[in-house]
Curated annotation (Swiss-Prot):
It is found in: Mitochondrion inner membrane. The keyword NAD applies. It holds the Pfam family Oxidored_q5_N. Keywords: Electron transport, Membrane, Mitochondrion, Mitochondrion inner membrane, NAD, Respiratory chain, Translocase, Transmembrane, Transmembrane helix, Transport, Ubiquinone. This is NADH-ubiquinone oxidoreductase chain 4. Its EC number is 7.1.1.2. It is a multi-pass membrane protein. GO terms for molecular function: NADH dehydrogenase (ubiquinone) activity; ubiquinone binding. Belongs to the complex I subunit 4 family. InterPro entries: NADH4_N, NADH_UbQ_OxRdtase, ND/Mrp_TM. GO terms for biological process: electron transport coupled proton transport; mitochondrial electron transport, NADH to ubiquinone; mitochondrial respiratory chain complex I assembly.
Amino acid sequence: MLKIIFPSFMLLPLTWLSSNKKVWINVTTYSLLINLISINLLWQNNENNLSFSTMFSADPLSAPLLVLTTWLLPLMLLASQNHIKKESEHNKKLYISLLVCLQTLLIMTFSANELIMFYILFEATLIPTLIIITRWGNQTERLNAGIYFLFYTLVGSIPLLIALIYIQNWTGTLNLILMTLDSSPINQTWSNNILWLACIMAFMVKMP
C-alpha cells in the first residue's frame, strides 16, 4: 500500500515547490499516475496476491474504494480551476494541499487493518473537508453548512466509537485480519441490532 500512500503524500512538497504556472499541471498529472498505479489493485483477487501488513492492506472489498478515491484529486482539480482562478497563488496551493491531504487520509482509511485506526483516519478527513467548505464554498451559507457538518459528524461518530469499544471488549481485538479467524457464531439479538445501527450511523451522517 505504500506505493499509493507515499506518492500521494509526496504531492504536498510537489505542490509548494512547483512554480505558479505549472502547479496545476504537475499535481494533476502525478495524481493521474497514482490512479493508474492503483488500478493494479483490482487484479489482486486472491489472498496470495495481497500485501498484508500490520497496518495497511487491500482486499477485493477495499480495492475498488481505493481506486475511486484516487480519482478524487484529479477530477476535483480539473473541476475547480475556474472557480478559484481569482485567488492568490498561496491560497491556490493551500487549496490543492488540502485536497491532497483529504485523498491521502481517505486512502489510509480504506486500507487500514485496525478498526480504531480506521475510526481516527475517518474522522481526520473532517478537518480538510471542513476547511474547504468554509473557505471555498460556493454558497453564502457555507459557514453555517460547515458548522452543521462539524456538529452532525461529531455526534454521529460517538456511537461508532462506543461500538468499537464494545467490539474490542467482546472479541479482544480490532484487527480485521484476526477477526476473520474468529469462528464464534453471531447471536441475532436486539443488542447486535443496536450495535449495527451505531456502526452505520457515522457513515449515514456523511452520506449527504
